[in-house]
């Protein structure tokens, strides 16, 4: 009886572990993640895909160039050049996401502020970019200046609340950004 209980216990642990880690790298490099929980690892679709719904947290959420819609798109949500729509687009979300070509609409499209990169990177540039297009909100000077100017001081409808995500750390990208 003791052995069978131990076996059942070990099987349960194995299943729980496999189930927990199954979200890691969900979508891998270029796929899409749809549904409630796409977090961990490269999270919601890795490099290039899109994340829709629920919690798309974990690193690189939204991937490089993809889009993050709804819920919580966690670290790097929105990625480089993608869009971040609704909910909380977390660390870097709307930063590179809104900054380098994409848009950040609604919720908190934050990103950090780094003294070494005061204007162009990390979420605040996203707010600046939105200031040009859709009207940014309270980011750094870009977010306040351009967002306040063309966004009528309030971010122009869906400008959101900039500058409340993570901190820009160039080492994460392994290079010159």
UniProtKB/Swiss-Prot annotation:
Residue span of region 5 X approximate tandem repeats: 25-112
UniProt protein name: Eggshell protein
Transmembrane spans: none
Keywords: Repeat, Signal
Keyword Ribosomal protein attached: no
Disordered: region residues: 149-177
Biased composition, class Gly residues, residue ranges: 149-166
Coiled-coil region: none
Signal peptide as annotated in the record: 1-18
Tagged with keyword tRNA-binding: no
Sequence repeats: 25-41, 42-59, 60-75, 76-91, 92-112
